[in-house]
């Protein structure tokens, strides 16, 4: 079974980094409503588009998701 996207993303937290992956990790950590137990692209993408209290480049998200799948 694959780790949830959130669990994987938390391994990428680095407040000193300007990489999109580290930025998303820090934003997701601060967002209490972020879907923490899913590995479903549509669920996470929909959350980022419609419910997140922050904005994030969805093109960067697509690249990060691809990296998650390859991990």
Curated annotation (Swiss-Prot):
Q: Which Pfam families match?
A: YozE_SAM_like (PF06855)
Which InterPro entries does its entry note?
UPF0346, YozE_SAM-like, YozE_SAM-like_sf
Q: Which domain of life is it from?
A: Bacteria
Q: Which family does it belong to?
A: Belongs to the UPF0346 family.
Checking NCBIfam families in the record gives: PRK13672.1 (NF010193)
For this entry, the protein name equals UPF0346 protein SP_0947
What organism does the UniProt record list as the source?
Answer: Streptococcus pneumoniae serotype 4 (strain ATCC BAA-334 / TIGR4)
Source species taxonomy: Bacteria, Bacillati, Bacillota, Bacilli, Lactobacillales
